[in-house]
């Protein structure tokens, strides 16, 4: 069963949020969706946190004709992993994004114009502090769980370290305590693609720049896949529409990247892409602490980690570093290494590989 037709909601907070940079952002609008019913003692809420280019549209459809359901539709609904007969599931769009929450494409109330590059640099920690405002608004004192993959996993880490008394458990998939130099360098090249697109106009564009963002998305998309998955899907096949010795002829993998890159341009704001890339690069769960050990000393909730064998963006050793530290500190932690050919995106594509473990973990968290 599915959650059916859903509605996006939003709330605007007139209070200012002091950011990690020291700058002030306000008012703040947060777009969110909820699924299921909050129980009488408000103890069954699960916050699902999205990745880089995700949104609050976690599951269901806005109308019958909507082509695709929410981005993790397979795990949310009656009888599914996040059973809406049991849990009240929340997903909000992070600040800095472009799907309803305040970001660089939003109107600055002080100027009446889009923020563009006057928008302050935000961090993952800032995103989570904004989410805490939403949870307060919903009247929830303590979340049953926070669950997310990739940048969503970073948000779950921040909930565990910054709001340790407000979560009962955390499920973290395909993430890292801090992006590596390689991960940062790939985002840097993606930024160059945008900066060198003349239609970007230093962020003051009227129409979303196409070529720079499409190329940047193509670079990012490669990091989400793996050699195994790309070989299986495309191999070295040449596009049937092109002659092999046509200078501009494309391999199937080229055509795929081209299609997905330009399709992305139609749904995502370029400046938001840049701001969230910066937030990813800046991320360090130990920011503000002397060490990872000191950061994880704050953790109180049981934590469950998943890494995927072919993920080369945030490879398993990065997850294992966190697990070792939590074990050293005597914190309750589970770790599962999933054998997968789908690379970083495995957490989105192979939910059946982790569903049984997460279901049991969530039940224990509520025991």
Swiss-Prot record:
Binding site for substrate: 217, 345
Catalytic reaction equation(s): L-homoserine + acetyl-CoA = O-acetyl-L-homoserine + CoA
Enzymatic class: transferase
Pathway, per record: Amino-acid biosynthesis; L-methionine biosynthesis via de novo pathway; O-acetyl-L-homoserine from L-homoserine: step 1/1
Gene3D superfamilies the UniProt entry points to: 1.10.1740.110, alpha/beta hydrolase (3.40.50.1820)
AB hydrolase-1 domain span: 44-350
Domain of life: Bacteria
Gene Ontology CC annotation, any one: cytoplasm
UniProt subcellular location: Cytoplasm
Pfam family, any one: Abhydrolase_1
Gene Ontology biological-process annotations: homoserine metabolic process; methionine biosynthetic process
PANTHER family for this protein: HOMOSERINE O-ACETYLTRANSFERASE
Function statement: Transfers an acetyl group from acetyl-CoA to L-homoserine, forming acetyl-L-homoserine.
Name used for this protein in its record: Homoserine O-acetyltransferase
UniProt organism field: Geotalea daltonii (strain DSM 22248 / JCM 15807 / FRC-32)
High-level lineage: Bacteria, Pseudomonadati, Thermodesulfobacteriota, Desulfuromonadia, Geobacterales
């Amino acid at each position: 069963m599915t959650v059916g037709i859903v509605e996006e909601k939003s709330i605007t907070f007139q209070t200012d949020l002091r950011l990690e940079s020291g700058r002030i952002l306000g008012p703040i609008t947060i777009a969110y969706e909820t699924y299921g019913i909050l129980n009488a003692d408000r103890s069954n809420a699960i916050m699902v946190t999205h990745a880089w280019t995700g949104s609050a549209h976690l599951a269901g459809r806005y109308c019958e004709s909507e082509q695709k359901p929410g981005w993790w539709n397979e795990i949310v609904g009656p009888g599914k992993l996040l059973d809406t007969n049991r849990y009240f599931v929340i997903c909000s769009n992070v600040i800095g994004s472009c799907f309803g929450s305040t970001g660089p494409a939003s109107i600055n109330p002080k100027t009446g114009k889009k923020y563009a590059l006057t928008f302050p640099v935000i961090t993952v920690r800032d995103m989570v502090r904004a989410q805490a405002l939403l949870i307060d608004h919903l009247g929830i004192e303590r979340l049953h769980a926070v669950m997310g993959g990739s940048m969503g996993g970073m948000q779950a880490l921040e909930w565990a370290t910054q709001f340790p008394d407000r979560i009962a458990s955390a499920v973290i998939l395909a993430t890292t305590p801090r992006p590596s130099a390689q991960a940062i360098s790939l985002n840097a090249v993606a930024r160059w693609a945008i900066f060198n697109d003349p239609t970007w106009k230093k962020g003051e564009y009227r129409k979303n720049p196409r070529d720079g963002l499409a190329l940047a998305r193509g670079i990012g998309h490669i990091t989400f896949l793996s050699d195994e998955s790309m070989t299986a899907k495309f191999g070295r096949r040449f596009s049937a529409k092109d002659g092999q010795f046509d200078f501009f002829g494309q391999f199937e993998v080229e055509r795929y990247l081209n299609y997905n890159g330009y399709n992305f341009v139609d749904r995502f704001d370029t400046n938001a892409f840049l701001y969230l890339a910066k937030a990813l690069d800046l991320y360090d769960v130990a920011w503000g602490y002397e060490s990872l050990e000191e950061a994880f000393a704050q953790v109180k909730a049981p934590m469950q980690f998943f890494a995927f064998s072919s993920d080369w963006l945030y490879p398993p050793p990065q997850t294992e570093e966190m697990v070792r530290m939590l074990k050293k500190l005597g914190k309750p932690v589970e770790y599962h290494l999933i054998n997968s050919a789908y690379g970083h995106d495995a957490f989105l594509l192979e939910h059946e590989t982790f569903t049984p473990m997460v279901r049991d973990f969530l039940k224990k968290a509520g025991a």
